[in-house]
A protein has these predicted regions:
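N-terminal periplasmic/intermembrane-space "pro-region" immediately following the signal or transit peptide
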Residues: 18-86, 92, 96, 100-103, ...
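Transmembrane beta-strands of outer-membrane beta-barrel pores
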Residues: 61-69, 113-117, 145, 156-158, ...
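Outer membrane beta-barrel
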Residues: 98, 103-223, 254, 433-435
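Repeated loop/turn-to-beta-strand initiation elements of outer-membrane beta-barrel proteins
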Residues: 55, 103-107, 147-150, 202-205, ...
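Outer-membrane beta-barrel "beta-signal"
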Residues: 176, 432, 444-458
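Residues that define the transmembrane beta-barrel architecture of outer-membrane proteins
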Residues: 85-91, 132-137, 144, 188-192, ...
Length: 458
């Protein structure tokens, strides 16, 4: 019954529809006598064919290496040597298309083609052969009229005020394939959805429906996050129709925004367990749950304060069964919050901080006798970002720090992007990681990655 009420709420918006001084009459502004061509200050002629004008292309070449030889601790207590090696050696072509082809209509799409060269982990995973990949990112058609807008296609929906680590940013799936992608903005995967928005004075109502929910893809073989699973991880077998739906109401007040939201979602991460026979493909389980949230911000001069709160009902967590050998899942409730701020130091410098904490509620009531949790009851992380635009915007410094609240794992990144011309840019980056032995990032402890990316936009 609660899901029917939520869907009805999502569908409701579809039915709502200086004074000039006098100059002498004989004043002559002619340039004929000083030899200046009439078209000297004319804008450059655009020779781009009309059919190509909606397109933007970016061709990039990337090289990144783990450059710190060191040893790491293994699960059995021993240590293993880790040599320096090339991790990413790839070329990519990013294509963007944006065409407002008629009043109130917009067609937008983007896709990427990648080639993996010798040295890249994708090359090694492909048995030392050059590999290729194509991915369609976004592809949607938007219709806007009056105070309403409808979008249909592959797109993202982002909830929450905090950028980068909000507890409400859970609608789209994500893929952190390697350490070149450390920001959620770059890791989000588009999903096929219908999204509509309607504006009423100082407030906005937006809703979405997803008739084919997808799940986070497993780590790519050879990537820094890959581990050899005990059983083969296959795609989720859909034995019934799945859907997601959500709605959000947002009020804009003087210096503040407040939003309330509700959604019926599937967890982005599948839960895996051993097959009954002990051989073959792992069993995958998708958990559906109800999300209730509230978010707010407050602007005070150059400071913007953000707060997001999420309550999740019937989230699945992994447990060890009473027999001590089998694993399973139980449904629990979870409460989480993200508090942070954005501060504009000046016109060139910005600072962002967000802290997230989540806790499982009354787990003892959900666990059967003899069962125990295989996950932490309390988790949290912090995100710090600093950016500085130098040399009239030609040089951009970006610093990122991510850490678990207990400092069990820490990642730091420093990037410099230098604009060589209107079309050419060079980005250099250093990424360092530290992790405790019992952390999921323990294999990355002590790593130092150095790299560069050369990009040509046309």
């Amino acid at each position: 019954m609660r899901y029917r009420i939520l869907i009805a709420a999502c569908l409701l918006p579809l039915g709502l529809h200086a004074q000039a001084q006098d100059l002498p009459d004989n004043l002559d502004f002619s340039l004929d006598g000083i030899g200046i061509s009439n078209d000297l200050f004319a804008p450059d002629e655009d020779n781009t064919p009309a059919w190509l004008q909606p397109f933007t292309f970016r061709l990039s070449q990337q090289l990144i290496a783990q450059s710190n030889p060191h040893s790491i601790s293994l699960a059995d207590g021993s240590r293993a040597e880790k040599n320096a090696y090339v991790e990413n050696h790839r070329s990519s072509l990013l294509l963007r298309y944006q065409n407002p082809f008629a009043p109130g209509w917009l067609l937008q799409a983007s896709g990427q083609v990648k080639l993996y060269w010798p040295g890249d982990y994708e090359y090694r995973a492909n048995r030392d052969h050059i590999d290729t990949e194509f991915r369609l990112n976004e592809f949607f058609l938007q219709r806007s009229e009056g105070n309403s807008s409808v979008k249909l296609g592959a797109q993202t929906v982002v909830w929450g005020e905090n950028i980068g680590n909000s507890v409400l940013d859970v609608i789209n799936t994500s893929e952190f394939r390697d350490l070149t992608i450390i920001d959620i903005e770059d890791a989000r995967l588009n999903q096929w959805m219908l999204v509509w928005e309607r504006f009423y004075g100082n407030h906005q109502w937006s809703s979405f429906v997803n008739l084919y929910p997808e799940f986070n893809p497993p780590p790519v073989r050879g990537s820094p996050f890959f581990f050899e699973p005990a059983f083969n991880l296959t795609d989720y077998r859909r034995d019934k129709a799945l859907f997601e739906a959500g709605t959000q109401m947002r009020w804009s007040l003087t210096g503040s925004d407040i939003s309330v939201m509700a959604a019926y979602l599937y967890e982005n991460q599948l839960h895996y367990s051993a097959p009954p026979s002990g051989m073959g493909n792992a069993l995958s389980e998708a958990g559906d749950y109800l999300l209730l949230g509230v978010s707010a911000n407050r602007a005070i001069g150059r400071l913007l304060l953000n707060l997001d709160i999420a309550y999740s009902h019937d989230i699945l967590v992994d447990v060890m069964m009473a027999n001590g050998s089998d694993t399973g899942t139980v449904a629990v409730r979870k409460l989480g919050g993200t508090a942070g701020f954005e501060y504009a130091i000046d016109n060139e410098q910005n600072l962002l901080l967000g802290v997230t904490a989540e806790t499982l509620l009354k787990t003892d009531e959900a666990l059967a006798p003899g069962q125990r949790l295989l996950v932490d009851r309390h988790t949290g992380n912090a995100l710090l970002r600093y950016s500085n635009s130098l040399r009239n915007g030609d040089l951009l410094l970006s610093v990122t720090m991510q850490s678990a609240l207990d400092a069990a794992s820490v990642l730091g990144s420093v990037a410099l992007q230098y604009t060589l011309s209107n079309h050419l840019s060079l980005t250099t980056q250093a990424i360092a990681t530290r992790a405790d032995n019992d952390s999921a990032l323990a294999p990355l402890d002590g790593d130092l990655r150095l790299g560069m990316t050369l990009s040509w936009t046309f």
